[in-house]
Amino acid sequence: MCIRDRAVFTACNDDENGTTPPPAPSVENLGGIVTENMTLTANTEYKLTSQLQVKAPAVLTIEEGVKITAADSEDPIYILIEQGAKINAVGTVENPIVMTAENKTAGGWGGLHICGYAPTNAGSGFSEIGNAAYGGNDANDNSGVLKYIRLEYTGFALDDEHESNGISFYGVGAGTQVSYVQTYVGADDGLEFFGGTVNVDHCVVVDCTDDSFDWTEGWSGTATNLVAYQTDASCDCLIEAD
């Protein structure tokens, strides 16, 4: 069951002129299992209180200007798009979509994970976070659209073997569109591809602790206009290609 509830916060009136300040924006809580289409409305703030797991054939639509803030929690909090489900998250230059965390440090939350039916050279597998199946034979599989999105403070680790990146693409197909995506101050990798055929362009990774861009299991898509900016000496590599 998906949880969506609204909390409204208002400020006291301390204005000496007696005018009433505008109310603070409402914040909707998010979390749970999504089995029906869901839309996150433009210019609205959401608090991610647990994992948000989208199951087929549901579509998660995120409109421009949406801000999603993951709660500060010892439990894994992430967004997972399963095989056959979609995410259509389309921001704009002036009004991007922002996914961030209350804990403003690398590893503050678990990031975005997308699983598709495209082939990998390791056969089928399961995501490191969420244990969702991925892989198949549909090179043109479509998991949706990501455009003008910034993800901050990602990289939550369950343990030494199960880590999250900014965005993890698991067997994602070429029908998926990925453009103008940024990850900022993340633990582990910025973008990682586990097989699949998805093509990406205009992607920026700033200060991750491991690899800026990482691909394995025979990813065969294309990548154009990539930028990696690293100031942390602990950063591993700009690119790791297995």
What positions do the PLM features span?
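Conserved small/polar residues in nucleotide/adenosyl-binding loops
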Residues: 1-5
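C-terminal motif of bacterial Sec signal peptides marking the signal peptidase cleavage site
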Residues: 8-11
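Beta-strand/loop edge motif enriched in small/polar residues
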Residues: 13-242
